Amino acid sequence: ILNGEVDYVVFAHGADSHSSDDLGGQCGTWYWLECSKAFAQWANHISNLLGRKLPVVLALFGGYRKDDYNSVLDLHIKSILACSNIIYDQAIEDKLKIKEKTSSVY
């Protein structure tokens, strides 16, 4: 990146690792979002070293809950908000709630 050999970075964050996902992930919401925040902080650090914003792409995928798919979407929105609040130095409030999984589907 610092040598100019990389033009942008893709952050691939899959919701299937979340503890409420039907695939049985083991990462709770707080830790899952800390991953997003750590990426955003790293991107800001690299941007400071470059003297310009590092172009980033957030690739949000996965999430296989059949009982409440909106919780999967809300989890992805939480990740976008966590990253954008850090990268763009903003304070968009996150009021989304992730419902606990009601039963195992698989």
Descriptions of predicted regions:
Residues 1-106:
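A general "terminal functional-core" signal
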